[in-house]
Amino acid sequence: MTAISPFYYHKSISAFLKEDESAIFSALEIADDHADVKATQRDVWVDEVLILKKELSGFTGDIIFEYSIPRLGKRIDVVVLIKGIIFVLEFKGGCSKINRSSREQVWDYALDLKYFHEASLFAPIVPMLVPFGACKSELEIERSKYHDQVYEPIILKKNEIAAAVRKFLEKEHSASPLNGFLWAKSRYSPTPTIIQAATELYRGHNVKSITRKGATGKSLERTTRAVLEVIRDAKKKNEKCICFVTGVPGAGKTLIGLNVAIQQNAIAKNISGEKAVYLSGNQPLVEVLSEALARDQYNREIVLKKNLFEKVDRKSGEKSRKKGYTLAEARIAVHSFIQIVHHYRKVMLAKLKHPFGDALEIDTRNCVKSEKDGYAEVDRIAIFDEAQRAWTCNELAGWLKRKKRLTGFKWSEPEFLIWSMDQHPGWAVIICLVGGGQEINRGEAGISEWIKAINKSFPKWKVYIPEELFNKDFSDKEAKSELSACKSKKLLPNLHLTATMRSFRAKKLSAFVDSLLNMDTKCAIKTFKEIRAQKYEIVLTRDIKKAKDWLCQRARGSERFGLMASSRALRLRPLAVDVKHKASVVHWFLDDIKDIRSSVFLEDVTTEFDVQGLELDWGCVVWDGDLIYNNKGWIQRNFKGNKWQKNGDHWNRRYQINAYRVLLTRSRQGMVICVPKGDDNDPTRKTSFYDSTYKYLKSLGMMEI
């Protein structure tokens, strides 16, 4: 077995039954590189091997221990292949009562194999939970109610495995045989959520191991290498440079930013001032990612038994238990490289001399100059996600006037951020991750403002750009003009991401949503048929309860689902959908059914501002009277006081359409769109506000539930 093998041990069942237990334990120990947990793990393996040697006697097939599921950052205890059926076994030591999370865990393993493991695509998969202690078993087995042949988890006593296997063999007698060797080596092509991907990168896995093989994985890997090379070159030549990374929607630009930050910080672990910081103006994304990484790090420390240690009082010699690594410490560690851009900007603004003159000046009375970093912040590499959303001069000046009572600010946010990094003596690097097509706020400067700032104020900075910015498909004429005037630019390959990784079931979901919102009915009908053929579900209802029931019936394991609506959807309150109530995005995205703030509790609703950049498995979009279908074009409205008013502002109309674009592209596996019936007794919820939209959506081919 090689170091990159996806499993620790694989043999035919007959070979496993004949092999000496000590040889099996030795093979497992050699494969396991976690030396500090081997003693505990060995005891578990001893129990598993002894149980399975007894229970699998008389069967033919294959057995695999510790099969890796990179997307989830876990390993399946045991996979058994018998007559075309995949049995996924998860053993629980010392447990007599199985909780919800244990069921979700083994179900997640089975679903992950079904979705992303090629050799498992057409095979029945049976998740089994086997507590070592006494338990109430579930030997009454019904045929899988799901079209993909993944069974619900069953709980078995350790001496009931053989009996359960026989029952499943009777039910699935027509299953096609599986070649054990080919199955174990089969291609695993995951499409992780951004939360899952970020967590695995933070754990030390590379981007290649956690993303879909082929175009997506290769594209991400090439771009990461290209950006790291820019950083190395800047350091070597003691230069300042700005590097632009572009990509199609859902191509993984955020993942590139996080990957570069994590890899650069690993390279510069013991080198002060050479670390990278990932900065985003998307506060919900930063909050959710930061908390997810911190929780995962903290939980792994507990698993490794480093969370508690003995403290000896020097005077008395008495021993006491002291809390070790805390969640607060984990959060601080994550915050060191993932931050909200507004906080970074605020720190640098505080260093400026007031009132503002014709040039930005440091107020030397209020800050100390570092010998190594000058007046800059400590990080020499700043990664700005969604860089096109940085504010124009008018927007930033207006904010400073309203919030800080500071007037006369003459610089755009891109120019100010470049100036901030220019305070470093020697080299510095800015990475701009640039997307497009989902503007939901006014005052966004776009890529042109970054180039304009370089041309105007920082001509010595080198500019690295992807060749695609000069393609005819790139529509930003102002940016093209600024780039043409830029004397320090250099075109680099591999700075543009071309393959989407957003939905593993419907690669054309974005195209469908575009045609739906553009009212291109013919194209929408055609694209809808294509995504339905890919088993991506979109259904329609007028009943919020039916919508919630549909979500609960579709979600399996720990798959996330929840309610979403436009931030302008103010007349959904009679349905108990209140967008004015601010959801706690961290709890909404990360917590389970036990927390009423969780998405899966189906009480709190999120808006486009909460979910942009994040994903659900299954979503419900509740459609209000803020966007009404009319065959001459969308009727767009804002709710003011006690009535709806037409939205006539060009940019606000664009943001409103894009709000629905964001909401309709958040669900990875399927969604239900709920268009309420309305109530003619309520002048703000007339049935006419909803009927035309419902009929339009239904005409595209959506099934009504």
Identify the function of each model-found stretch.
Residues 1-190:
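Accessory nucleic-acid engagement/destabilization modules that flank
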Residues 211-241:
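N-terminal pre-P-loop "Q-motif" helix
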Residues 245:
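Hydrophobic anchor at the beta1->P-loop junction of P-loop NTPases
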Residues 253:
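Conserved lysine of the Walker
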Residues 257, 440-444, 468-625, 629:
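Conserved helicase/translocase motor-coupling segment
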Residues 321-421, 603-607:
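Conserved RecA-like ASCE ATPase "motif II neighborhood" in helicase/translocase motors
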Residues 383-481:
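Signature of the SF2 helicase/ATPase Hel1-core->accessory helical subdomain module
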Residues 429, 601-705:
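C-terminal accessory regions
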